[in-house]
Amino acid sequence: MIEALKPLVLAAVVTLILGPPVLAFLRRLKAGQTVRSDGPRSHLAKAGTPTMGGVLFLIGLTVSTLVLAPPSPLTLSTLILTWGYALIGLVDDGLKVILHRPLGLMARQKLGGQVLLGLVAGVAAMLWLGRGSVIQVPVTGWHWDLGWYYPLLAALLLVATTNAVNLTDGLDGLAAGITLWVALAYGILALTLGQGELVTFAMALAGGCLGFLVYNFHPARVFMGDTGSLALGAAIGFLAIMTRTELVLPVLGGVYVLETLSVILQVVSFRLTGRRLFRMSPLHHHFELGGWPESRVVLFFWALAIIMALAGLYLLTI
């Protein structure tokens, strides 16, 4: 177990060391966040905070994984996929900065890139990385061979996870803190499965998030942007794919699911009844507008993330 902590520590240290120069570089680029006018009014003060900060933990994750993981197709695939989704986010963030608007890529452009990468990842996992096309149904012991439908499931999972993390990234330290616990859960799971490369990757991901929180917790000095949130979602989604826990991910990453459901329910309720279920969605804004300080909301959701991660691990033991 001590060996498994090395990737976490190395990624955290690299992220911490890179923080000051990367933040200075982003300020020189004037890569400030444009805040949406329809969000909580308290967030208007965050305008101008450097964005695209996800590159910080991405570098920490990459360095730690390459240094400590045995070189293999799986190691390289996890990094390439994570950076592929990060690149979509980087383009999106860059357009926001250049055009001085809260929206970057068009939705269909963003979604198209995510689906394409997801399909490629699904095929690669099935044919070249030894994952196969069988999914396991938790608790029941059932197995289901999807054959060539599996890449579709993989793409759906990756697109859903990346966008769920993106929705969760709405408060200082929220997405990074939640992903820290989900990544730790996957590190423990991969350790029990004897998947050494995934142990290193998952723990390095947790370490990168930990180091990033030093700069991202309230009041944040940098935001991860879509660069970071899409990368985190891809990393978690691919961990689920390669550990064959696609159907357990909604529990392990339960907070992501709650955030996404709150948005869906809000839209459906308003269209059907003209009323909103929540003060604002995603769910974290509901608590924020209810008078909770931002840090309290974040810590509450972190605690919920820990509970859900433990519940997911327990589910796999039944």
Curated annotation (Swiss-Prot):
Pfam family for this entry, one: MraY_sig1
Membrane topology: Multi-pass membrane protein
Sorted UniProt keywords: Cell cycle, Cell division, Cell membrane, Cell shape, Cell wall biogenesis/degradation, Magnesium, Membrane, Metal-binding, Peptidoglycan synthesis, Transferase, Transmembrane, Transmembrane helix
Any one Gene Ontology BP term: cell division
Record localization: Cell membrane
Needed co-factor(s): Mg(2+)
Source species, domain of life: Bacteria
GO CC terms: plasma membrane
GO molecular function: metal ion binding; phospho-N-acetylmuramoyl-pentapeptide-transferase activity; UDP-N-acetylmuramoyl-L-alanyl-D-glutamyl-meso-2,6-diaminopimelyl-D-alanyl-D-alanine:undecaprenyl-phosphate transferase activity
Entries under InterPro entries matching the protein: Glycosyl_transferase_4 (IPR000715), PNAcMuramoyl-5peptid_Trfase (IPR003524), PNAcMuramoyl-5peptid_Trfase_CS (IPR018480)
Pathway note: Cell wall biogenesis; peptidoglycan biosynthesis
Reaction catalysed by this enzyme: UDP-N-acetyl-alpha-D-muramoyl-L-alanyl-gamma-D-glutamyl-meso-2,6-diaminopimeloyl-D-alanyl-D-alanine + di-trans,octa-cis-undecaprenyl phosphate = di-trans,octa-cis-undecaprenyl diphospho-N-acetyl-alpha-D-muramoyl-L-alanyl-D-glutamyl-meso-2,6-diaminopimeloyl-D-alanyl-D-alanine + UMP
Main location: membrane
Enzyme Commission number, as recorded: 2.7.8.13
Function: Catalyzes the initial step of the lipid cycle reactions in the biosynthesis of the cell wall peptidoglycan: transfers peptidoglycan precursor phospho-MurNAc-pentapeptide from UDP-MurNAc-pentapeptide onto the lipid carrier undecaprenyl phosphate, yielding undecaprenyl-pyrophosphoryl-MurNAc-pentapeptide, known as lipid I.
Name of the protein: Phospho-N-acetylmuramoyl-pentapeptide-transferase
The organism of origin for this protein: Moorella thermoacetica (strain ATCC 39073 / JCM 9320)
Gene name tied to this protein: mraY
